[in-house]
Amino acid sequence: MTSFADIGKKEALKRLYEGSGFAAGTPVAHKVLLEGVDFNLVYFPLKHLGHKAVTAVTGELFSLLYHPETLSVVLGVSAKLDYPQVEEIWQGVTTAAKEYGYKNVSLDLQPSKNGLCISVSASGERSKLTEVRRPKPHIKDLLCVSGRLGAAYLGQCVMERELERFEKGESDRKELEQYKMLVGAYLKPELDPGIVGKLEEAEIIPSAGCLITHGLADAVKRIAEQTGFGAKVYADRIPFEGNSFELGRKLNLDPVSAAMNGGEDYQLLYVVPILEMEKFRRDFQTFDIVGHLAQSEVGTVLVTPEGVELPLRAQGWKEDE
């Protein structure tokens, strides 16, 4: 009998699509957030939770160069939640929907026996520039990320440490204040609402893109799968929040590992044509170039400051992928 451990998540999805008559990768983004799996209501502000759910699906649209249009939300509400709490979640949803420019938003409520469940779907309009001339990817095209990586995972670690202290009656909240930028990256990730429009205005069209949801390693593997090329990521070019290494030493955790395999950064990863490098650097200074496409036989690797190439490993992928 085949197990998920044998084939990995990506191969499982590929096999399920085979013979179904449908293709993967439709321009509809979907996300399900489950209490106890994706969030802890003990410390997660409900308004931030609603906002984060919308950011998760909006980022998928941005990665495909779509302008957001329609948002659909279904809340599975458990008995422990009252109307004011549901209203807080909805306020976070509508705030994010306005920020990101959605034209239509729908909401449905369903009962849940197993805690809060948030199901969000989004669709949008494709950028007109991609209809005319989406460039083909080439070796040396740039891997560009929209913000700091590993911050959300480290922020979650801070919240879990504070929860343990709170349960022991030792909470002083000093660490929350000290690492508030990391905590904020976890509780309320944000994307530039105008990123697709800015790319259109600059006439820079990425040849591929994805949203970083399960670490940079997973995202780079997805890019390699999309383009058919290998990819190199340089450890000394990964952008980090200011005190990531300070916290990493305290937790005995390598921030590079958090960036490569941590989750929920919700930053964009675009493949930008090498010929557009100077223009991209000038017009998109909040992005960092972390690597480039390579020959397919290279695979996907992390290059250390010493020049050693380490194969990327990511949850949901087989070891040889």
Model-derived regions: residue spans:
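Glycine-/charge-enriched secondary-structure boundary and capping motifs
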Residues: 1-11, 77-103, 110-118, 123, ...
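Extreme N-terminal cap/leader segments of soluble proteins
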Residues: 1-45, 73, 92-95, 321
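Short, surface-exposed beta-edge/turn micro-motifs
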Residues: 25, 141, 265-268
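Glycine/charged-rich beta-loop-alpha catalytic/anionic-binding loops adjacent to active sites
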Residues: 35-43, 126, 177-182, 252
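Small-aliphatic-rich amphipathic alpha-helix that forms the alpha element of a beta-alpha
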Residues: 46-70, 91-99, 198, 210, ...
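Short beta-strand-loop/turn "lid" adjacent to the catalytic site in phosphate-handling enzymes
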Residues: 66-82
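Phosphate/diphosphate-binding glycine-rich loops and adjacent basic-rich segments that engage nucleotide
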Residues: 128-188
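Polyanion-binding loop/helix "lid" in catalytic or ligand-binding cores
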Residues: 173-222
